Structures are given as structure tokens and as C-alpha cells.
Amino acid sequence: MKNRFYLITAVILLLPCTLRAQWSVGLLGGAGYNVHSQDLHYLTDHRLQGAAGLNFGLTGQYDVTDWFGLRMDATFTQKNYRQYRTDLKEMDYHYRNDYLLVPVLASFRFGGARLKGFANAGVYGGWWLSCSQQGSELNSFSGKTYEFSRKVDFNADKDNRLDLGLAGGLGMEYGISRHWAVQLEARGYYSLASQVKQYMRVQDYRYDTTVVLQAACLYRF
């Protein structure tokens, strides 16, 4: 008898949350800025500079209540950067790194019926899809500078293609109608996985911090 009472009580308590639960799916797109960090050791005239990149993909969210939901995205995100030398200005490298990122986030919403603010926080996993390089180099034999654009092949012993880290963002949402809504969000990705495996005696850790500004169009079921 007590078990039935507990079961009925649990159903009654969870019923309002179930009735309010709502699925939404959509498309998102925007642009980002990536900052690459690494220990340059004795390379005293080498410099690193952040660079802009694209960000677009799919999003899905399950709203448990009117103020809390679970969100997961799948995005194509670029983590680009520039490396150059101050003593040899001919040596200038621009790296384009394409990633597939899958953030899983807790989403907290607040505000009115149509215009709401939200905060997302969670973790992400990703995969380094491709890398390319363009810029200029100095030929030490001829003394001439030449420009190049080339694809960089991955080295299984050196490159760590698995990306893991923290993700979070702040944004606004406007409900156009019962089923449609648009969002604008500023989100940050902080990588906890080095791009380089520590296969040498000298440690070489390389990390990315990426901030994106993205807009999304959502359909609510």
C-alpha cells in the first residue's frame, strides 16, 4: 500500500514537468575568434596571433521546465590562428583548423513570455577534421620569399585529434510564434586537450580558446 502511495505521489509531482516538457530543433550559424596558446620555449622572435573563423551547425534542446532544459549542438567550428616571426617578417604562417564540436549543455532561462535571457554551461567533445596552412616563407638557399597554400597531413604519433573541454554562453531568445523562436548567443569554448601528444622529452602543450557569436532559428514541437 505504501509503495502505491509513493508511486502515485511521484507521478503527481512529475506530471506538471512532463506537460511542460518541450522539444526544439534548429539551425545555427555565426563567426568566432580563436586564440591559440603554446610554450614557444627558446623561439624568442616567434609570435602567435588569434584569427577569425566560421561556426555553423544543428541544435536540439529538451526543455524540462519553463526555466531549465538540456541542449546539444553539432557544429562545424574553425579554430584558426597566425604564427609569425618578428626578426624574419618573410616567415608568416596562417593556420586553418576545422573541427566538429558536440557541446552538451544545461540551459537556464529567465524573463518574459516572448523575450527571454538564457545561460548555457557544460562540456564538449570534438574531432579535428582538417588542417591547412598558407602564408610566406624565406628560401634560405636562394634568399627569395615565396607564398604557399597547402594542406597539412596529420601525424598519428604527434597530433591529438580528439578535443575535449568546457563550454558556456549567454544569450537572448525571442518567441516569434507558438512554434518558432530565434536566439542570439555569445559562447566560449575552453579546450582542456592539447593539440599535440607529449611524445618528446620536451613537453609541447598547445591549447585553443574560442569565442563565437551565433544566431539560431528554432522550431518547437
Residue ranges: model-predicted function:
Residues 21-60, 159, 220:
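Short glycine/proline- and aromatic-enriched beta-strand/turn motifs that initiate or cap beta-hairpins
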Residues 41-46, 87-94, 153-158, 199-205:
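Extracellular loop and loop/strand-boundary signature of outer-membrane beta-barrel proteins
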Residues 23, 31-33, 37, 61-143, ...:
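Gram-negative (and chloroplast) outer-membrane scaffold detector with strong preference
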